[in-house]
Curated annotation (Swiss-Prot):
Protein's UniProt name: Pregnancy-associated glycoprotein 50C
Miscellaneous information on this protein: On the 2D-gel the determined pI of this protein is: 5.7, its MW is: 50 kDa.
Residue positions with a glycan: N9
Superkingdom per UniProt: Eukaryota
EC nos: 3.4.23.-
Species assigned in the record: Bison bonasus
Annotated disulfide bonds: none
Annotated tissue distribution: Chorionic epithelium (trophectoderm) and placental cotyledons.
Predominant cellular place of this UniProt entry's protein: secreted
Keyword Transport carried by entry: no
Transmembrane spans: none
Recorded family membership: Belongs to the peptidase A1 family.
Amino acid sequence: SQISLRGSNLTI
């Protein structure tokens, strides 16, 4: 899944 954190994209 992809999570948006402070404008950064984290793909986990």
